[in-house]
Amino acid sequence: MDGGAEGSQQPHLILANKLFLLTHPDVPDIEKVQLKSEVLDFIRSHGMAPLYETLIASSVLDLDQSLLESMRAANEEELKKLDEKIADAEENLGESEVREAHLAKALYFIRISDKEKALEQLKLTEGKTVAVGQKMDVVFYTLQLAFFYMDFDLVSKSIDKAKKLFEEGGDWERKNRLKVYEGLYCMSTRNFKKAASLFLDSISTFTTYEIFPYETFIFYTVLTSIITLDRVSLKQKVVDAPEILTVLGKIPFLSEFLNSLYECQYKAFFSAFAGMAVQIKYDRYLYPHFRFYMREVRTVVYSQFLESYKSVTVEAMAKAFGVSVDFIDQELSRFIAAGKLHCKIDKVAGVLETNRPDAKNALYQATIKQGDFLLNRIQKLSRVIDL
């Protein structure tokens, strides 16, 4: 994508977030009025006729025929100039200048949000590119375009292409940037464990400011780590990480969310959790997984609480979390039924009894299950052979 000073988020991805909020069911109408004005101003200043037409068709924006026609005319004029530069480069200059002229046209299509023509022109530019590093840059432009449209099929294919390019060479700076792109892809497709691993690997080398600021990166790193790391790893890699500590306090509720969980301050955790929920709900990458993530966090915190007890009263647990007995009873019933918690409720006594399997028992049960599966496969195979 074009624009965006070094070290700042691409303007198009800021626009993408505004478009997400503009169509979000929970954003108040008064805020949407301001968002609509900001979106229209951005489209007008960047001459984004193709995007404007798409948003009109989906009833996000209203049609202003004169604006649309003026943007179309400006697009045609600029594309004519770019084609003239390509022709001049092909006639009078070298391969490097030809490539740059084609890339300029690709970036213009990205700027005006003409996705299909941008991809076509990026492919053409890639064909005129020799250096692995420059080929990687074309992939990064494609990834930014794909994240703008939330086209995860294109993201996946582009990441695979980048990894193949790295087999031919490539520098560490670009390899580290790719980890963040892949981490964002994994988080956006609900692979939180891999996302956390990739984000944690990138903390000390983060330079991917074009897709989000460093604070947002830390926000995602903490969120994905909390539901995927054990306590020891969480302490080593997140709670005590200097890079995280430097910005943790700048992100509302995040410090309380992380530290109260680790320090078993459950009432404070639930208070911070409510604040975090709002931020997750208004994040374009996390919103589709909002309910899933909220369940996973509660599974982690309830499991951690119960880990310390063989039995505990429901009332004591409710008090620890600062909620009513009825609430915690309903919560636990759902989580136990879903197989998320290893305990049972004695309704008469109002007591929770844990029955979590130890590591040896878990391994034993898994071995039996795998053995039964193997035996069934052998029996099916023997019947086929007998026939």
UniProtKB/Swiss-Prot annotation:
Q: Residues bearing N-acetylmethionine?
A: 1
In which domain of life is the source organism classified?
Eukaryota
Q: Which residues form the PCI domain?
A: 191-359
The UniProt entry, under SUPFAM superfamilies, shows: Winged helix' DNA-binding domain
Q: Which family does it belong to?
A: Belongs to the proteasome subunit S10 family.
Q: What is this protein called?
A: 26S proteasome non-ATPase regulatory subunit 6 homolog
Q: Which UniProt keywords apply?
A: Acetylation, Coiled coil, Proteasome
Tissue specificity statement from the Swiss-Prot or TrEMBL entry? Ubiquitous with highest expression in flowers.
Q: Name one GO cellular component term.
A: cytosol
Q: How does it assemble?
A: Component of the 19S regulatory particle (RP/PA700) lid subcomplex of the 26S proteasome. The 26S proteasome is composed of a core protease (CP), known as the 20S proteasome, capped at one or both ends by the 19S regulatory particle (RP/PA700). The RP/PA700 complex is composed of at least 17 different subunits in two subcomplexes, the base and the lid, which form the portions proximal and distal to the 20S proteolytic core, respectively.
The UniProt entry, under InterPro entries, shows: PCI_dom, Rpn7/CSN1, Rpn7_N, RPN7_PSMD6_C, WH_DNA-bd_sf
Specify whether Acetylation is a keyword of the entry.
yes
Which PANTHER family does the entry mention? 26S PROTEASOME NON-ATPASE REGULATORY SUBUNIT 6, 26S PROTESOME SUBUNIT 6
Question: SMART domains given for it?
Answer: PINT (SM00088)
Name the Gene Ontology biological process terms.
Answer: protein catabolic process
Q: Does the keyword Flavoprotein apply?
A: no
Q: Which organism is it from?
A: Arabidopsis thaliana (Mouse-ear cress)
Q: What does this protein do?
A: Acts as a regulatory subunit of the 26S proteasome which is involved in the ATP-dependent degradation of ubiquitinated proteins.
Q: Which residues form a coiled coil?
A: 65-101
